[in-house]
Curated annotation (Swiss-Prot):
Binds DNA as a homotetramer. Isoform composition of the tetramer may determine transactivation activity. Isoforms Alpha and Gamma interact with HIPK2. Interacts with SSRP1, leading to stimulate coactivator activity. Isoform 1 and isoform 2 interact with WWP1. Interacts with PDS5A. Isoform 5 (via activation domain) interacts with NOC2L. Widely expressed, notably in heart, kidney, placenta, prostate, skeletal muscle, testis and thymus, although the precise isoform varies according to tissue type. Progenitor cell layers of skin, breast, eye and prostate express high levels of DeltaN-type isoforms. Isoform 10 is predominantly expressed in skin squamous cell carcinomas, but not in normal skin tissues. PROSITE patterns: P53. Gene3D superfamilies: 2.60.40.720, p53-like tetramerisation domain (4.10.170.10), Transcription Factor, Ets-1 (1.10.150.50). Residues 437-450 have a biased composition (Low complexity). Residues 123-157, 361-371, 379-389, 451-472 have a biased composition (Polar residues). This is Tumor protein 63. Residues 123-171, 351-393, 435-472 are annotated as: Disordered. Changing P279H: In colon cancer. Changing R97P: In POF21; uncertain significance; results in increased transcriptional activation in a luciferase reporter assay; affects oligomerization.
């Protein structure tokens, strides 16, 4: 700040208590701002709290925040007399708001402002002797959130429990995680062998089986590799794979081992291996820290042992199993996943050859049957293979067919379709019918809104066509091109009348591959969008949205609250789009999820409130348009802080002018000396 030069001497000192009370008036600030101010005012190391490191920690926690600073300057000056003393108080405040730009993260409701402030309070207490008055007030009501700075004391401290049914879908992840095997022998004497055709491992019990781990980019520090067995078939997948009682209780392979006797998979030659049993699901797995490949190699080798036969009664009992190998961070986040089938047997080479021959015969038989629809004799020659007999053809539901696919991306897409069709068989028929009815109601509801928007009164006939064409040239902002929610908010109100007829389905639900079952044979897909471009950049079409309660809660990361809605007969978002916070509280929804659901309802309302094009195209973010109930949406990752500077300047006249202001120091000293002598 700039100060006027004065011939008066300047003295700076700490302000009086009434000034401190004025600054800390709680009515002017939120409790989070008061928290920052009380912490900084009580600390003996104020510079540490005002240093850029504290705000950098918050900045890093929000990854890529939207930061806005609003400076506030206040000046209080007593009216000075001519050449007299003055008392000047200057307060400079910076109101800082940092908000995460990615509000679609399903985990963001768990990282509340209160949880972050509690973690910062712990860091501040560790670095200074100051304490906050909010520690005791909010200790019991605070939402527990992990500290963004704290690191686990051990590699395996923060591992999250595995789901009830682990995923068996291959996922290379951001590091191109892959699992492979060395060139194996098919001889009967081989202790292990791997079939790339069947994607299946054959090995003997308690024999070393090397597995090669490969990544294209190094994973984060402290990454681990987990190996977990699961049953392959759907009727057994919920059971935990363990050793049979015979091998578990025998002394063979158990004496002198650190691994629990019930674990099927063991790691050999790694003293850092840790055997984990999930306390909720009971699934057993073994973890080893990830080690980068040695010089001259591109693989990291892990030696695994399988401690029970697939045919053991009381254990696997001839049920096929899958081995899921995942690359995870120290807090349990999956960075990559690979899966393969395993069979533990006495003669791996023999069993592999038998399985491969059987599958080849099955493929030849299927291709022959599909090539000619007429019945063929039981004895025939096909490609040089003598078919002495053909078994009775299975029913279409039990028949296994194999489709060779070129390219992993195509394979994973077909695999998702296959899994979706299989899961469809487990749904009851009334659930399917309800879903189709919801889709039809949603389709009709959006069509009605579309019709009301395209009415002539909505556009008005006073504006000339040239003005309408100019509105088409207005381009959306970058945030609207990136944010899918605002992309859905683009409506036909920004399109001229001449072009509105060509896009009757704008803003409606476009059926995807998963919605084909909801269309009757008489219904047709919406016509393709035809939008003649009048500029070099055309806004993208809106994304299709699923307005069911299940999808709505899944997008918010609140899937656990589904029962609170379904028990009341609420199945679509349109049934709760007018709900308030009191309505959500009446449903007995937990408070930590209530704010997130309320924020999602507000966003849904915003998407269906068709405003003028200028509002849609000039809005910098969705957060600025949601003003209703802003005090109730504190669950988002938004941090408000106030950084202030208080300076009080008192100016005194020169010493030779003190007599004019009855401020003679020599006279006061003489008076005090006389009082002292009289007292003696």
């Amino acid at each position: 700040m700039n100060f006027e030069t004065s011939r008066c001497a300047t003295l700076q000192y700490c302000p009086d208590p009434y000034i401190q009370r004025f600054v800390e008036t709680p009515a002017h600030f939120s409790w989070k701002e008061s928290y920052y101010r009380s912490t900084m005012s009580q600390s003996t190391q104020t510079n540490e709290f005002l240093s850029p490191e504290v705000f950098q920690h918050i900045w890093d926690f929000l990854e890529q925040p939207i930061c806005s600073v609003q400076p506030i300057d206040l000046n209080f000056v007593d009216e000075p007399s001519e050449d007299g003393a003055t008392n000047k108080i200057e307060i400079s405040m910076d109101c800082i708001r940092m908000q995460d730009s990615d509000l679609s993260d399903p985990m963001w409701p768990q990282y509340t402002n209160l949880g972050l402030l509690n973690s910062m309070d712990q860091q501040i207490q560790n670095g200074s002797s100051s304490t906050s008055p909010y520690n005791t007030d909010h200790a019991q009501n605070s939402v527990t959130a992990p500290s963004p700075y704290a690191q686990p004391s051990s590699t395996f401290d923060a591992l999250s429990p595995s789901p009830a049914i682990p995923s068996n879908t291959d996922y290379p992840g951001p590091h191109s995680f892959d699992v492979s095997f060395q060139q194996s022998s098919t001889a009967k004497s081989a202790t292990w062998t791997y079939s790339t055709e069947l994607k299946k491992l054959y090995c003997q019990i308690a024999k070393t089986c090397p597995i090669q781990i490969k990544v294209m980019t190094p994973p984060p520090q402290g990454a681990v590799i987990r190996a977990m067995p699961v049953y392959k078939k759907a009727e057994h997948v919920t059971e935990v794979v363990k050793r049979c009682p015979n091998h578990e209780l025998s002394r063979e392979f158990n004496e002198g081992q650190i691994a629990p006797p019930s674990h099927l998979i063991r790691v050999e030659g790694n003293s850092h291996a840790q055997y984990v049993e999930d306390p909720i699901t009971g699934r057993q797995s073994v973890l080893v820290p990830y080690e980068p490949p040695q010089v001259g190699t591109e693989f990291t080798t892990v030696l695994y042992n399988f401690m029970c036969n697939s045919s053991c009664v009381g254990g696997m009992n001839r049920r096929p199993i899958l081995i899921i190998v995942t690359l995870e961070t120290r807090d349990g986040q999956v960075l990559g996943r690979r899966c393969f089938e395993a069979r533990i047997c006495a003669c791996p080479g023999r069993d592999r050859k038998a399985d491969e021959d059987s599958i080849r015969k099955q493929q030849v038989s299927d291709s022959t049957k599909n090539g000619d629809g007429t019945k063929r004799p039981f004895r025939q020659n096909t490609h040089g293979i003598q078919m002495t007999s053909i078994k009775k053809r299975r029913s279409p539901d039990d028949e296994l067919l194999y489709l060779p696919v070129r390219g992993r991306e195509t394979y994973e897409m077909l695999l998702k379709i296959k899994e979706s069709l299989e899961l469809m068989q487990y749904l009851p028929q009334h659930t399917i019918e309800t879903y189709r009815q919801q889709q039809q109601q949603q389709h009709q509801h959006l069509l009605q809104k579309q019709t009301s928007i395209q009415s002539p009164s909505s556009y008005g006939n006073s504006s000339p066509p040239l003005n309408k064409m100019n509105s088409m040239n207005k381009l959306p902002s970058v945030s609207q091109l990136i944010n899918p929610q605002q992309r859905n908010a683009l409506t036909p109100t920004t399109i001229p009348d001449g072009m509105g007829a060509n896009i009757p389905m704008m803003g409606t639900h476009m059926p995807m591959a998963g919605d084909m079952n909801g269309l009757s044979p008489t219904q047709a897909l919406p016509p393709p969008l035809s939008m003649p471009s009048t500029s070099h950049c055309t806004p993208p079409p809106p994304y299709p949205t699923d307005c069911s309660i299940v999808s709505f809660l899944a997008r918010l990361g609140c899937s656990s609250c589904l029962d609170y809605f379904t028990t009341q007969g609420l199945t679509t978002i349109y049934q709760i789009e007018h709900y308030s916070m009191d309505d959500l509280a009446s449903l007995k929804i937990p408070e930590q999820f209530r704010h997130a659901i309320w924020k999602g309802i507000l966003d849904h309302r915003q998407l269906h409130e068709f405003s003028s094009p200028s509002h849609l195209l000039r809005t910098p973010s969705s957060a600025s348009t949601v003003s209703v109930g802003s005090s109730e949406t504190r669950g988002e990752r938004v941090i408000d802080a106030v950084r202030f500077t208080l300076r009080q300047t008192i100016s005194f006249p020169p010493r030779d002018e003190w007599n004019d202001f009855n401020f003679d120091m020599d006279a006061r000293r003489n008076k005090q000396q006389r009082i002292k002598e009289e007292g003696e």
